[in-house]
């Protein structure tokens, strides 16, 4: 086991603060509408230029092990806030730095770190309650566009396209972000249910111009097992042909003579048919087949339910107005399922979303809700260069998270104003002892920092602007983008309540841990082995 180096009390905390300052000073340059750029070196390819705080934080690793521990703890604040709310990473970093910096001054002056932490936690609780009171619901597309614009570093086109996507697929709909091929951002909306499985054979193609399959008014056969024998399928094929309708088969797999027979029938024009694999795997596949069954008003033909392919009736099959299939996806438009059954299924999945603890499961369940309830929107990000594309895509993803957070918990005035208004509640708040009251004062000072930094990045004097904003009430604040004072909501400068709340809670949590740190342990740096000594007579040549 390698030897360790141990640092205690003030020495440990000051080394940690040095790391916090290096990371936070780099990240906070990006805050606000006039945030500066940070250039990140890449081991290959062009450097990346970004105004995204979390991207900057992720790049920072320090040589000194103790300083690096401080930097990594603040990095945790940024990434945790990003995970929970999708934005607010820079605000969280600025708050964490301010709390740690002010807190360590008090600890060095002899205050009890545990009491300071209790005071900070008490103050955070009060500020969070104030933010909830300030919060207004975010329902109209104008407010959604404004939130998206602010989060995407004041890029209006991004805010507009996100609002448009939410309008189209609803608040529950799935919105994904992809790299586009043009210079402009584009919005593609997929109506109906789409899943990632394409045709099993190119011989099913009946639309040469799109290289896809289009089935009008088809029946849908759903089966949870592999189909290899044509004997199993014959009864269904005969009944469908007699009805003069097309057929889509969705099964675990279709191969062998079954697939060959379907292809031959399709090519000869005896029966318009197509086969695709069922989406998902394992239990998720069963659930998704059940979703498709409810959407199309059919039944999953499963031996577990005592149903077999040979005994299938037309009433067991699902129906849809139109189904489009290409090499990679299948889209079911206007399924014949009853609205009540679909609604009940959506409610059932929503209950599962509430109960699940896994982020991955939650995401997959939300996708299923969207496919049943609304649709899927794809935002294709356009840019001139690869570097710009990556940076823009990251901003669109941030903005999308922020708008979802706004819809969830509402909005507060942006530009650091909400925290200044919540500061009023801390003026009369006192702790159980002097040191706890010091903790409350530390937080009261720290929550001014986001506004100060936004103003500093815009090249103005922070103290002057702060005093003017504190004189005002309600949504009165400072627009750093235009250097004007006014109503922040009217000017469209909004922050999701969830983002501001998460940033404050995460910053205070990690800062509290740092203030109460008494020892730090790190591996000793390895001594570099010297090179070979110079050979005889080499000195003169050096």
Swiss-Prot record:
Xref: InterPro entries: Chaperonin_Cpn60_CS (IPR018370), Cpn60/GroEL (IPR001844), Cpn60/GroEL/TCP-1 (IPR002423), GroEL-like_apical_dom_sf (IPR027409), GROEL-like_equatorial_sf (IPR027413), TCP-1-like_intermed_sf (IPR027410)
Subunit and partners: Forms a cylinder of 14 subunits composed of two heptameric rings stacked back-to-back. Interacts with the co-chaperonin GroES.
Name assigned to this protein: Chaperonin GroEL 2
PANTHER family: 60 KDA HEAT SHOCK PROTEIN, MITOCHONDRIAL
Keywords: ATP-binding, Chaperone, Cytoplasm, Isomerase, Nucleotide-binding
Statement: the UniProt record of this protein carries the keyword Isomerase: yes
A GO cellular-component term linked to this record: cytoplasm
């Amino acid at each position: 086991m390698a030897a360790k180096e141990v640092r205690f009390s003030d020495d440990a905390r000051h080394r940690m603060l040095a790391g916090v300052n290096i990371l936070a000073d780099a990240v906070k340059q990006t805050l606000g509408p006039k945030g500066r750029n940070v250039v990140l070196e890449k081991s290959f390819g062009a450097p990346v230029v970004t105004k995204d705080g979390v991207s900057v934080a992720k790049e920072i690793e320090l040589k000194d092990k103790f300083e690096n521990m401080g930097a990594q703890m603040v990095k945790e604040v940024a990434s945790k806030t990003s995970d929970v709310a999708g934005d607010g990473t820079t605000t969280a970093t600025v708050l964490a730095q301010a709390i740690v910096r002010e807190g360590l001054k008090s600890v060095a002056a002899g205050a009890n770190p545990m009491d300071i932490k209790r005071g900070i936690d008490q103050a955070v609780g009060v500020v969070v309650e104030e933010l909830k009171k300030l919060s207004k619901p975010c329902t109209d597309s104008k407010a959604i566009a404004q939130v998206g614009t602010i989060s995407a570093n004041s890029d209006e086109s991004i805010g507009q396209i996100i609002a448009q996507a939410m309008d189209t697929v609803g608040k529950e709909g799935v919105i994904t972000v992809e790299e586009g091929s043009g210079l402009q951002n584009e919005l593609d909306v997929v109506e109906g249910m789409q899943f990632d499985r394409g045709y099993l054979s190119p011989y099913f193609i009946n639309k040469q111009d799109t290289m896809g399959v289009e089935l009008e008014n088809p029946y849908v056969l759903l089966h949870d097992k592999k189909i290899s024998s044509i004997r199993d399928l014959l009864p269904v094929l005969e009944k469908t042909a007699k009805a003069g309708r097309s057929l889509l088969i969705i099964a675990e797999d279709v191969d062998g003579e079954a697939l060959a027979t379907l292809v031959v029938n399709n090519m000869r024009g005896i029966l318009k048919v197509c086969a695709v694999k069922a989406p998902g795997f394992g239990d998720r596949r069963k659930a998704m087949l059940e979703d498709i069954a409810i959407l199309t008003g059919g039944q999953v033909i499963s031996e577990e339910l005592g149903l077999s392919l040979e005994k299938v009736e037309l009433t067991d099959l699902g129906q849809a107005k139109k189904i489009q299939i290409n090499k990679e996806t299948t889209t079911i438009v206007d399924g014949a399922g009853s609205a009540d059954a679909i609604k009940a299924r959506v409610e059932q999945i929503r209950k599962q979303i509430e109960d699940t603890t896994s982020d991955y499961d939650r995401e997959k369940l939300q996708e299923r809700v969207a496919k049943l309830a609304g649709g899927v929107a794809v935002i294709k990000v356009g840019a001139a260069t690869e570097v710009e594309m990556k940076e823009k895509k990251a901003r669109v993803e941030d903005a999308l998270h922020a708008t979802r957070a706004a819809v969830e918990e509402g909005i507060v005035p942006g530009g650091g104003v909400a925290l200044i208004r919540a500061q009023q509640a801390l003026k009369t708040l006192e702790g159980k002892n002097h040191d706890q009251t010091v903790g409350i004062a530390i937080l009261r000072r720290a929550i001014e920092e986001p506004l100060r930094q936004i103003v500093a990045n815009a090249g103005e004097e922070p103290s002057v602007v702060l005093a003017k904003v504190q004189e005002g009430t309600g949504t009165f604040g400072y627009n750093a983008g235009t250097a004007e004072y006014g109503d922040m909501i009217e000017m469209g400068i909004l922050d999701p309540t969830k983002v501001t709340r998460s940033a404050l809670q995460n910053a205070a949590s990690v800062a509290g841990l740092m203030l109460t740190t008494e020892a730090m342990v790190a591996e000793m740096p390895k001594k570099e082995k010297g090179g070979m000594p110079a050979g005889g007579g080499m000195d003169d040549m050096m």
